[in-house]
Amino acid sequence: MSEFWHKLGCCVVEKPQPKKKRRRIDRTMIGEPMNFVHLTHIGSGEMGAGDGLAMTGAVQEQMRSKGNHRDRPWSNSRAL
């Protein structure tokens, strides 16, 4: 009899939980940006391979010169 339970135990395994199907997002589900404030522009040539770290400080300084954006109330960038 114990041999029966031994064989039965070998066949019973815990089944993995089925993965939840992720909802696929398409373009119609994505709206326009909210609270977007354009602070600066970085061109493709400005962040070259050799000067990336040095340029980062310059970009941060340029953003600081635009004013303290954290103190400004955020608003929608679209005109109503």
Swiss-Prot record:
Residues 30-43 form the CRIB domain. Keywords: Cell membrane, Cell shape, Cytoplasm, Cytoskeleton, Lipoprotein, Membrane, Palmitate, Phagocytosis. One of its GO terms (biological process) is small GTPase-mediated signal transduction. It is found in: Cytoplasm, Cytoskeleton; Cell membrane. GO terms for molecular function: small GTPase binding. It is a lipid-anchor. Its main location: cytoplasm. InterPro entries: CRIB_dom (IPR000095), CRIB_dom_sf (IPR036936), SPEC (IPR039056). PROSITE patterns: CRIB (PS50108). Residues 48-80 are annotated as: Disordered. GO terms for cellular component: cell cortex; cell junction; cytoskeleton; plasma membrane. A lipid is attached at residues 10-11 (S-palmitoyl cysteine). Probably involved in the organization of the actin cytoskeleton by acting downstream of CDC42, inducing actin filament assembly. Alters CDC42-induced cell shape changes. In activated T-cells, may play a role in CDC42-mediated F-actin accumulation at the immunological synapse. May play a role in early contractile events in phagocytosis in macrophages. The CRIB domain mediates interaction with CDC42. Interacts with CDC42 (in GTP-bound form). Interacts weakly with RAC1 and not at all with RHOA. Belongs to the CDC42SE/SPEC family. This is CDC42 small effector protein 1.
